[in-house]
Each structure stands twice: as C-alpha cells, then as structure tokens.
Amino acid sequence: MKSNSSTAVHSNAFNFGEFVSGGVDPRTGMYTCALSLGKLHSADLNGPDVTFSLSFNPLNQADVGFGVGWSLTMTRYDLRSKIMTLSNGERYKAVETSTGLKFKEMKLQTAKVLVTGPGRYEVRYKDGRRELLKVMAAAQIAVVEKIVAANGVSITLKHDVFNQFPVLTEINDAKECLLRIARKAGQVTLTRHPDTASSSDYKLILKNSLVTAIELPVGKGWDLEYEVIDGARYLHRVVNPLRAVEIIRYKQQGHHFVNGVERTLPFVIAHDVYPGRGQSRLCKTYTYSDRNFLGHGLIPAKDDDGDPLYRAPGTYVYTSDEQLVVGGKLHTLIKRTYNKFHLLVAQVTTCGDAQTTVATEYHCSVAKPFNEQPAQFRMPKVHTVTYLDRRTHQQRKETTVTEFDGEGNLLKYVEPNGVTTVSEFYPATGGDNCPEVPLGFARFQKKSTVTAAAAGGPSTVTYYDYVLHPALAGAELASVLPIEERDFELVQGVEVLRSKTERSYLDTPDDPLKHGATREQSVTRNDKTIRTAFSYELEGTRLRVISSTRGFDDALQTSEKVLSTRTGLPLAEVGVDGERIEYEYDAIGRALRKTIAAGTIYAASTQWAYLAASKQQMATMVTTDSSGGEQRVAYDGLGRVVTVQEKDTDHPDKEGLIPTRTLYSAMHDAAGQKVRSTLTDWRDGKPCPVVTLYEFDDWGQISKTLHADGRIEHTVADPVLRQQTTWLEGLGKTVTLVNEFGKPLSVERFSLKDKSLGKTVYTYDGSGRTTSQTDPVGNTTRYEYDAFDRLVRTVLPDASEMVTAYADHSDEAVPVSIAVDGRVLGEQTYDGLNRLTASIVGGRKSEAGYEAGYTQPKWFKGAGGIKYLYLSYCFKMHFC
C-alpha cells in the first residue's frame, strides 16, 4: 500500500490548537512546529499588531519562500483549490458567491469574507480587525495587502512571487518599514525594523530547500533535521535554543483514508525529549485507533469536497493513546476520544491507582447531520472532571456548565463551586446604549450578573454602555468604544449602585497616535468621583504616557510611563513620588538593565547577561546587582532551573579570580518531576550541602519529603475526598478538608495513637468568603463583608462586635473607623488619593500633610502637638 502526504488532505481536525500551535497533535498524529518570533507593533502602538510566527506543516511539501513546509501565518485565499487560510492557521473550503465567500464548515462566523471588487476580498474579524486581500495573478492566490485595526489605523504588506507562490517581502506602517524579508541562496533573512537602531535579524538557513537552522538575533536558535517518507519531509530532530533535543519517530504506513483510497498518512509513534545537563529523558509513545480523523472505515462520498467525518454516523469516534514511559515501563496513560466533529469528548489520564476523566458535552448532536448543527456546535456545554481512586473505587465529580449563543458569546458560566455568571450581549444592530456594530458582529456585552452559590453571598450586576467613535481620517468605518460601566449589588432583589466607571476618548481624526486613545477615566462611589486624565507625547520611538489622578477633594497625583513604540516594552517609569526607573532590553526583548534613580547620585542598577547554551555550558542568566553581587542561574533544555551560583560578596574579588559558588541544584526524573534539590552553604570556603529528596504519588503530587537532618515529611493529598493529611514521621497527623473553593473546611490534629487533639471548623458563603471559625474548644468567631469583600463585622465568641467602616470613595481596604460594641476606638481620615491625613486613637489626634501628590508625608503632627517636618526625603529623585 502506498504511503503519501498531500496538501489535498482536508479535515477540520487541523483547525484545533494542538495542530496550529505545534508539537504532537494527538488528534492527527502529526508533529508540527510553530516558532513564535515576537509581535510587530505599528503606528506608535496605536495600530494593528502582527503576530510574527513561522510554522511547519508536513502536509505542505511546497517551498513557498521559507523552505519546504514552512510558512508565515498569514491570511491567504487560493482561487484554484478554493481554500481560505486565516491568520490563526485555520483552513476552510470556500463557496464563492457574487458578494463574498461562504464556508460550509465554518458554522461559527469568526470571520466574514466579502468580495470588494475584481480580484479583491475583505476579511472581517469579530474583534473589529479587517484584512484587505488582492489576487496576485501570477499565482492565483489572494494575499493581504493591508491590515486595518478597529480604530482605522492600518499597515500595508508587499509581496513578490517565489516558486509560483506569493511571498511576503515587507510590512510597513505610515512611518517606517516594520519587517523586511530578503532571500538569497541558502538563506532567508527576516529583519524587524530594518535600517534603524532597533534592527534585528532572524535567519532561516536552508539546505536543498529545507530549513536546517533558525538563527535568532542573539544567542542560539533552532537546529532541524528531517526524515523523508515517500518523498515527503517530516521533522525528525529538533534542537531548541536551550539545546533540548527532540527526537520524533513515525510509522510510515500510518493512518488509512476512507475506504477505497489506496494511501496512508504517517503518524508519530514516539517523541523523546532530552533536556540535557544530567536531567532525565522524557519519553512518550503514541498509538491510534483504526478509525481516525480521515474517516477510515467510511465509504467515500461522491462529493468529497468536505470533511468526510461530517457525513459519518453519530456513533463514529476515534481515539489516541499517549503513554509516558519511565524506566521502560508505563507511567501515565492518556486516552483521548474524539467524535465525528473532531471534538474531544473524553480524556482519561491513568497513573497507577489515580484516574482523572475529563468529559465534555458540546452544543452539538452527533445524531444530526452537519447542516442541522447550531452555529455554536463546537462550543462546550458541560465539562465534567471525575477523580477516581481505582483502589477504593471512590470518585468525585466537578462540573462546569457553559452556554454560548450563535455568535460564540458566553451567555452562562457555572463554576464547579456554584458561582454563576450570566451575560447578555447587544445584537449587531445595537441597542439603547450601544450603536450598530460596523462589521456586523454581536460582540459587545450588555449586562453581567454574578450570583453566589447556594450558601449565599453577594450577587452583583454590571451594565455596559458604548458609543460610536468617529472614524480616523481616511478610514472607512467608525469604531465602537466602551464609555460606562455601572456596578450594582443585589440587596434583597433591589439593585443598589456601588460604583460607576466612565471613559472618554481623544477625538483627533488627523492624528493616528492619539485618535481613540483614552482621555479620561472617572470612578464614582457614593457621589465622590476620582478622575484620571491621560496625555500622550511622542519623542521619536518613545511614547510617554502621563497619568494624572485627581481625588474628589482636588488632590492631584501624577505618574509617567515611557514605552518603546517598536516593542511595546516599558523604557522608563516615574512614580507618584518622583522615583524614576529605566529599563534596557536586548534584541529579543530580554531585560538587560534596570536603573533606579537614573542620572542622580542615588542611581543603582541591576544588570542581566544571557549566556547561550553550548556543549560546555548550560543556558545561563547572570544577574549583577548594584553592589557588585553576581548570581548565575542555569537552565536545562526545558527551561527548568538546575543550578544557582553566586559570588562571595562578603569577600569581594576585584580581579574576578574567585569562582562562583553553587547554592542550589536540582534533578528531575523521567516523568518531569523534581526529585532532588540541594541547598549549599559555605563555611571557610568549604561547601556544606543539604540534600532534600522528593517522592510523588499517582496524582503527581509530592507524597514524601526526605530532609537532610533525617526528618521525613509525609503528605497524602486525596482529590477524591478533597482531603490532605500531613505529618512528620514519628509525630501526629494533621488532616485538612477543603471545599469547592479550595479553602479549608476543617483542620484536625491527631496524636500518634490517632486520637483527635482538636478540630478547627470553618464555614463560607457562596462567594468563598469565611463566615465563621470555630476553634477546638467550641469558640466561634463570625465574619461579615461588604460588596468589595472587605471585612466589616466580626463577632467574637463572647458576643463582642467589632465593626470596621471604610472610606466611601474607595473599594480598597481603607478603614476610617473601628468600633467595638458600639464604642468607637479609632478613627482615620483619608484624602481623595487614599493618603492618611488624620488619626484619632483613644481621643488622641495626629495629623499628616503632603506636598503635591506624593505618598510620603511632608509633615507630621503628633498627639502632643509637636509638628515634625521631613526635609531629608528627596521627593524628586530624578532631579537630585
């Protein structure tokens, strides 16, 4: 039987995250590779962002400009095959109409495609983004020539033809080139921000049209090797920048197609990962059922234009098994079951006596044909996690219920603890407080109601209002922006307003930098309003955002943040007290330096250096603090910390002759668990290691800790009973029961003879807040809270009541009075910026005053009447 890979394989199994994001896809058995190379920001951070990602698909055996099988994740439409590939990697067969493209297999309209002219298409997304496509006649493929953000700001894309395929060459915004792609023999170079000080190169090294290495601007990159199966290339060996090695093995005569099709599709049967640096290999093997995502066992339809499984009977399912092998024996088995719509309906994970089953019911009915399924048929409806102890046969279930509408909006969410969130959305045509949505998607939330579980607790309602913001000059469509949120608490069925948030935006249609940016945000509680105004200043490639917060009493506080317009990373921050912090980064966004009080006599810097992994050394991050102390953290190929070393700062070594000393090291087993850690102290230049060993139970949790001093710590965590038992060998036990919120219901201590030494019991409301605590002798303390989860009332065992009141302008824990049994013991006063201005305790009053908007007091007046002035504090550190 012939084995073959083909781009003609059509299955919606490829439109799921495991396939699109890379790795071994348990649905299909394919090993794909997706390498994220960062995000491109545009238009001074006010334009569309482009995810910069390269992906390998073994089913694509063409070289479209990046090497065989490799491509950038960009939207395109092939007029010959009628296949539309979206920017998220999903692929759909299209039906062409006079007005646009329709996709029979895209029930939930995450994207709409319009025909805007001869050879031109427009892809509209739910988030308001648009992509304008133009057909390149030489290739008969439509590619993106412009991406327009919801606010109207756009970027343009340029393409050329390579090997009869359109290939991206440049991405530009209105100011500069964001990305340039150049090709020469044996190499493809992707340059971010070319011809600028921020320029950085990513290189694909090719040999015989195969990508054999991907080089990063700094440090190591990826090394790639392939296996050829019937003329098709499959990744066989992948080495990542940390030098972990992946080995992928395939079964050549793999998945069978529908009956009568004489070919097979290879699948992965083993995936080994070698982290290196003395860490254990991770070994996984895979097996698959005869029935598969290709529809083996089905009679092929005359019209094979769609997914064959969509025409399968409702009983058609296929499975895959993933086995984690440790020491040549099965350690963990994961069995996955998929229905005819490629939806994961069951996942059973078994390790020894521990078994966890995740079952998912969807908004679909497998008994009905595809054309009768609702738009949200792929969305989960009931998600049930079952914990089973196979030794005792006891089990416990946790259920999550979700409900989606035909637009994919989440209408109802019931958590396992019983807390329920119900949402309403405005229709695409809008409503009283929402304009018509320009792109025709119903995506704006109208109302959200959160109801506590059966035990009671606060229920809240939030309303959302929106406005149509004018279009940017030259843009076709206006944008919809949120302008108001009103938060209510339900008190005996009556909505009581607790806070209101209002937003306004800059209306500068001729200025893309500021148009649509937030101008002011105000929060009102109890008729007291706190306003924050924002201003924006562009200084080359530095965007300064100034936030000015004015309290209800007119107190003003200002802070600043400077962002790189090319990376979006913070370059500097100025806090409300004038403290300044500056940051520096390398070409791939890693921190290089952090300087506090830069440019002053108080300047102090922390620096980072990154040593690339090699045969001689591990990938290492070197941190040097302001006093010259140096720490080296080394990582294995999976990014796990394996050693920490430091220099002896007590005995400075200016010549750098004294080697660093190892303070910490770790070892991991073949299941990926940390089984050994060593902490090393140094005395008179000699190491004094302290070794701790760990053992794990079948649930993957630490069950035994062997300390260096001989102590043996036991932990039995039982997810079935929601019980945790801990003890030191030779001592009594502590048993803790937890509730649905993961909080303790009771903590009971036992003697060596299993005699109870006392039990503390807790109760909770339906929001998971503690309502009472009863100690081992029966004393009960009760608690009450306000709508912002602040403790307002405590009733002690002797019936004494402690009542705490908070500032009515804030939702933070800012207490203004504490009273016991009706008698006020203390009072405090805060200004509109939550700064303490006065305090009365036992009739004695103290006061504080502040300069401008600083948080530190300028003066303090004690109860004795003496006034203290603080003159030594440097308020404006960046000017000192």
Segments from the language model and where they lie:
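Intrinsically disordered, low-complexity segments enriched in small residues
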Residues: M1-R129, E215-P217, N240, Q252-Q253, ...
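Extended charged/polar low-complexity repeat regions
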Residues: L35, F52, Y92-C880
